From Swiss-Prot:
Organism of origin: Arabidopsis thaliana
Lineage top rank: taxon: Eukaryota
EC number: 2.4.1.-
Name this protein carries in UniProt: UDP-glycosyltransferase 76C5
CDD domains in alphabetical order: GT1_Gtf-like
CC terms in the record's Gene Ontology section: cytosol
UniProt-listed InterPro entries: UDP_glucos_trans
GO molecular function: nicotinate-N-glucosyltransferase activity
Keywords: Glycosyltransferase, Transferase
Amino acid sequence: MEKSNGLRVILFPLPLQGCINPMIQLAKILHSRGFSITVIHTCFNAPKASSHPLFTFLEIPDGLSETEKRTNNTKLLLTLLNRNCESPFRECLSKLLQSADSETGEEKQRISCLIADSGWMFTQPIAQSLKLPILVLSVFTVSFFRCQFVLPKLRREVYLPLQDSEQEDLVQEFPPLRKKDIVRILDVETDILDPFLDKVLQMTKASSGLIFMSCEELDHDSVSQAREDFKIPIFGIGPSHSHFPATSSSLSTPDETCIPWLDKQEDKSVIYVSYGSIVTISESDLIEIAWGLRNSDQPFLLVVRVGSVRGREWIETIPEEIMEKLNEKGKIVKWAPQQDVLKHRAIGGFLTHNGWSSTVESVCEAVPMICLPFRWDQMLNARFVSDVWMVGINLEDRVERNEIEGAIRRLLVEPEGEAIRERIEHLKEKVGRSFQQNGSAYQSLQNLIDYISSF
């Protein structure tokens, strides 16, 4: 760590696994460059302060009932959090600024800025009223962050109703999306989404800058276009975990027995299956995935979160005839140490929902993907994997045993898989070069450090 520069940065993550991890990683990056770190967080899904003893953690009430905490409706959860947390956040931030102003002597630190997740709709006006610069962190790709603001309008005014003959056509405004992807991305009434997205857009444009955990090597055209769209400084500092070795900021406890089990498997023979920390699936989806794994006859590591199968506790509905075979070839756990799993020599492929963090973790470990996107940005991420980078196979919405079995065989057994592995090795090297001196992520991070220090 560099010597303290006398500056403090306040960070405010959304309390979702895919949002907390990047924010904590960013905190670690800034701390290594001499900044002191304060993390404001909700009671719900609070990050593990004990894992980061050099940071200051401040908890604010979120007003969620036990029933609301268990909801699988992310849009409802975001609405409740934004409604309930505005006043407690304002009070907490005001006290922090007052405390900093009253400090004297060597202990005095200047609060440089606030960095807030793009899903918080009230942070920009509060920061502005307190004369504190605010930067926005997006956990999406640059491409999706841009396109989410116009997709509702495109769906309503341009692409609906969609003819069967148009399903595979590219969305001209946002390739590589297909027209049929828009319907899956916007699977709720667009009138409900419009006010939320409009607030996010206006808050972002009024902020002092925008941070992405991506780099120009992965999304060059969109980075350039985003600078034109938002007219604010944009920093693509690269996949966050590439700056530091993994440390646990997971909200779930990983099953560490995965690693010794993987140690017993042959190189690049195991298919790793995980659909992230938010996605829920039906009982029939789980059974189709189980049959696909069984019929592929390849060793596998399957993650099934408790409560992730709608209406069920865990995997109790998988038929005994399948479980017997599954137990012979694979291992089923409730949560896995994903970064450690992906870098293991035994992993030959990743059947993933294509959340952005999972996607770039797979790229950075050169693990080819089988894409099974379910919602929101995952469809666009999967298109990048299969159609742009060509480092995976896209199942789209086909949760069918034959499709899953075939994709596993194509990836791990057939010649097609070897070509995909070569391409993802090249992509890994390309992304890796972005972190070297004068690389895009390296330079963007340095620009971010200088920018924050200038406030």
